[in-house]
């Protein structure tokens, strides 16, 4: 009975996640009615005088109560954790592989941090050259971070270094801040990189000792003290790494740069070395302490000599100029890597835990469509798009993810499909889904109309009528994209 109750409640949870319905209480009421009849049928034996019958009744009542507790509390809690977090739906639900790699990475991180802290204590009491001990510590620390990052082999990592940066010349390294792992991404690049960190990390009970021995710089020390400490480390050949945004970005967008990093580079008379991190916010979001698979790209840009005044004369002007330059370069990285293939996993995962048939249909459909790369290629990056017969919304989501300047309206006759499409975590204000008959509906003016495998469901006269309606609402230099089955190839269709 416990299995039956769990399946029944799970069905309610899946229906709620799939369609956005809040109807779990009706499933619980049905379970409670079954529990009541079971207790009345078997639990009444507790009043029997025969000890065996009483034992059976007591065990039945305890068993039923336990089953109901698990079904009503633990089961919904686990499902909720799989698909939601504190800000709403997860943009990609938790999967078994991601969970396993998250646990392994967590244990490796904690174990590595404690070992490095112990190693720091040992080095402190060994009578040897301080600089050599520090260098050994930094080399091992860098290798450990490399191991931790590359441990999750399901997530590809790319380091793009077109200018052959070797970090031999000290610099102020700046990078966008997306997740906790950004520090390790910087440390694995070279052992001679020190990071300016906050007091929470500096005095952390797990990795604080290792960070302090590695001579990371405490942000709370104040600018004068920080400059003094940084100047000494620069003389020893180290580069100083600072996140000019100050805080992690949950969306991946570049936030406002603070001028402290550039002031420090000016005072120390060293270059600024910009490094772009892309994809890390999707692997470990700021508001979601859980590792997911994804491609992480680290791009090292050319050094900037502030004394040449290429980005302005004052520190304020240089900060704004470098921020604008950084945003432009980040946009180039996005356009290079945020392709339909990059986003296909996001779309597939949004239809996970919504039923096995839909899950497999989604995977097969997107694979057969080759991630909708052709549509993304021919549809303008900035356009108003109406997708007639949008189905579950796969194409609409792909077009919206690959360009934030596409405004999309998806229309389909099937109300259930529209409900499913509307209830995805990746849905944003770019997309509007409408249930209705495209023959009767009035269309909004659009730059692009898409009729993808739709017209063959209509007779010829309605096909012509639908196309004429699209033409009437088409903007100047707009396009109508029609793809449909060829009846002459009926056996292959």
Residues of each region from the PLM?
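Pore- and gate-forming transmembrane helices of large, multi-pass membrane proteins
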Residues: 18-48
């Amino acid at each position: 009975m416990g299995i039956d109750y769990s399946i029944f409640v799970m069905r309610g949870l899946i229906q709620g996640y799939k369609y956005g319905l809040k109807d779990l209480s009706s499933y619980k009421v049905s379970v409670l009615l079954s529990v009541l009849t079971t207790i009345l049928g078997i639990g009444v034996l507790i009043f029997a005088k025969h000890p065996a019958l009483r034992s059976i009744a007591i065990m039945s009542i305890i068993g039923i109560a336990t089953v109901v507790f698990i079904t009503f509390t633990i089961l919904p809690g686990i499902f909720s954790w799989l698909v939601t977090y504190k800000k709403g739906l997860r943009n990609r639900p938790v999967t078994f592989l991601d969970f396993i790699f998250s646990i392994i990475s967590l244990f490796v991180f904690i174990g590595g941090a404690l070992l490095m802290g112990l190693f720091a204590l040992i080095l402190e009491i060994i009578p040897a050259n301080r600089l050599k001990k520090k260098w050994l510590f930094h080399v091992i620390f860098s290798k450990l971070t490399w191991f931790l990052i590359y441990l999750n082999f399901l997530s590809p990592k790319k380091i793009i270094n077109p200018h052959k940066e070797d970090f031999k010349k000290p610099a102020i390294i700046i990078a966008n801040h997306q997740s906790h792992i950004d520090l390790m991404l910087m440390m694995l690049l070279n052992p001679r990189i020190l990071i300016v960190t906050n007091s929470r990390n500096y005095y952390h009970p797990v990795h604080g000792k290792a960070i302090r021995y590695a001579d990371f710089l405490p942000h709370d020390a104040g600018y004068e003290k920080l400059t003094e400490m940084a100047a000494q480390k620069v003389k020893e050949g180290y580069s100083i790494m600072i996140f000019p945004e100050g805080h992690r970005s949950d969306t991946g967008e570049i936030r406002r740069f603070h001028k402290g990093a550039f002031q420090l580079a000016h005072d120390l008379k060293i270059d600024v070395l910009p490094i772009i991190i892309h994809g890390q916010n999707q692997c470990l979001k700021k508001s979601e302490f859980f590792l997911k698979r994804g491609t992480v790209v680290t791009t090292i840009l050319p050094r900037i000599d502030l004394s040449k005044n290429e980005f302005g004369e004052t520190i304020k002007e240089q900060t704004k100029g470098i921020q604008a330059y950084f945003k432009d370069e980040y946009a180039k990285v996005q356009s290079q890597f945020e392709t339909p293939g990059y986003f296909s996993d996001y779309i597939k995962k949004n239809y996970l835990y919504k039923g096995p048939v839909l899950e497999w249909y989604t995977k097969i459909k997107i694979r057969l469509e080759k991630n909708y790369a052709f549509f993304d290629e021919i549809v303008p990056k900035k356009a108003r798009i109406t997708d007639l017969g949008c189905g579950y919304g796969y194409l609409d989501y792909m077009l919206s993810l690959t360009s934030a300047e596409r405004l999309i309206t998806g229309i389909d006759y099937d109300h259930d499909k529209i409900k499913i499409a509307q209830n995805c975590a990746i849905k944003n204000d770019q997309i509007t889904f409408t249930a209705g008959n495209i023959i009767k509906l009035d269309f909004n003016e659009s730059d692009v109309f898409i009729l993808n495998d739709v017209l063959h469901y209509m007779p010829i006269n309605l096909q012509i009528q639908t196309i004429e309606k699209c033409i009437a609402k088409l903007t100047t230099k707009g396009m109508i994209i029609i793809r449909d089955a060829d009846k002459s190839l009926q056996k292959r269709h």
